[in-house]
C-alpha cells in the first residue's frame, strides 16, 4: 500500500528504476501514466551499482528514482556512504528517491546499508520497510515509512486509506519489532546458511553465484543447453520452490533465485545444483 501511495502522490512524469528489480514498482508507475526507464545493473560487475556511472546518467527531468536495497532479485546492495552520494546528486537535480528496505534486516553483520540515518539530512527521499519478509508475516500488511519531508508526509497522510492498518496488525507489528530473541535467531540462521550455501555453490562449474546481502541468492546457469526453467523443474520434483528469473527485466533464461531455508532443505537444494 505504501509503495502505491508514494508513487501515486509523487505522480512522476519520468521515473527511473534500477533493474532488474521487483515488478510491482513498474506496475504502480504504469498506473499513474508516467514514462518508465531502467538503469540496468551489469552482470559483469556482479550486479553491483556503479554510483559514478549512475550519477553521470541522472538528469533533472527525472522526477522519481526507485531503489530496492538490498535489491530483489540480485541480492546486491548499496552502502550507506554511496547512498549519501546518490542522494546529494538527486537533491541538486530535484529528484525524489524511494528506497525500499524490505530486506535490510537480512544484511550481514558489519555492513552499513540502511539509509535511515540519512533521513534528518535529506528531505528528497523516503525509506519504506515492512514485516512480511524478515518476520514471515505477509498477511499482516504491516509496513512503515520514514522521511523528513513534512509536506510530503502530510500529503501521504491526507490520501492514505483511513483503515489501512487494523488494531490486531498494529499490536502484532509492535510485538514483532520488540522480539529480540526471534530477530537474533533468524538473522544468525540466515547469515550462517547464506555463507555456507554460497561457499558450496561457488565450487561448482555449472553455476555462478553473486554476492548476497538479502535472504536469497541469485544464480546464473552456466551449463550449455540448460535453462532456468529446467532448474526450476528439477527443484519442484524435489518439493523445493525456487524462482525462475526469466520474467525479470534484463534477465534472460539463465538465472534462478533461491531463498535461504533451514539446513536440511538447503542440503536438498545443494543436491539439485550438484546434479546439473
Task: Give a label for each model feature.
Residues 37, 44-108:
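Active-site phosphate-binding strand-loop segment of PLP-dependent enzymes
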Residues 1-13, 143:
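Conserved beta-loop-alpha segment that forms the PLP phosphate-binding cup at the N-terminus of a helix
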Residues 32, 92-93, 122, 238:
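Helix C-cap/helix->beta junction micro-motif
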Residues 191, 204-238:
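Conserved PLP-binding catalytic core of the aspartate aminotransferase-like
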Residues 24, 124-210:
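PLP-dependent aminotransferase class I/II
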Amino acid at each position: 500500500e505504501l509503495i502505491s501511495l508514494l508513487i501515486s502522490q509523487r505522480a512522476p512524469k519520468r521515473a527511473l528504476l534500477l533493474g532488474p528489480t521487483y515488478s510491482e514498482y513498474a506496475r504502480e508507475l504504469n498506473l499513474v501514466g508516467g514514462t518508465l526507464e531502467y538503469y540496468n545493473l551489469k552482470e559483469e560487475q556482479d550486479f553491483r551499482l556503479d554510483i559514478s556511472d549512475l550519477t553521470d546518467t541522472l538528469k533533472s527531468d527525472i522526477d522519481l528514482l526507485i531503489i530496492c536495497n538490498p535489491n530483489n532479485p540480485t541480492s546486491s546492495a548499496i552502502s550507506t556512504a554511496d547512498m549519501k552520494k546518490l542522494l546529494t546528486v538527486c537533491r541538486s537535480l530535484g529528484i525524489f528517491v524511494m528506497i525500499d528496505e524490505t530486506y535490510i534486516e537480512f544484511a550481514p553483520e558489519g555492513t552499513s546499508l540502511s539509509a535511515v540515518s540519512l533521513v534528518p539530512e535529506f528531505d528528497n527521499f523516503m525509506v519504506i520497510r515492512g514485516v512480511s519478509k524478515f518476520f514471515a508475516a505477509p498477511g499482516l500488511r504491516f509496513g512503515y515509512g520514514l522521511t523528513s519531508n513534512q509536506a510530503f508526509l502530510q500529503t501521504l497522510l491526507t490520501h492514505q486509506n483511513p483503515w489501512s492498518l487494523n488494531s490486531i496488525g498494529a499490536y502484532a507489528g509492535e510485538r514483532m519489532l520488540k522480539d529480540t530473541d526471534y530477530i537474533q535467531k533468524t538473522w544468525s540462521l540466515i547469515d550462517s546458511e547464506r555463507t555456507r550455501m554460497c561457499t558450496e555453490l561457488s565450487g561448482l562449474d555449472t553455476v555462478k553465484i553473486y554476492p548476497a546481502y538479502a535472504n536469497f541468492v541469485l544464480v546464473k546457469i552456466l551449463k550449455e543447453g540448460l535453462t532456468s526453467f529446467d532448474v526450476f523443474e528439477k527443484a519442484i520434483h524435489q518439493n523445493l520452490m525456487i524462482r525462475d528469473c526469466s520474467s525479470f527485466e534484463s534477465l534472460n533464461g539463465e538465472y534462478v533465485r533461491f531463498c535461504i531455508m533451514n539446513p536440511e532443505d538447503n542440503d536438498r537444494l545443494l543436491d539439485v545444483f550438484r546434479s546439473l
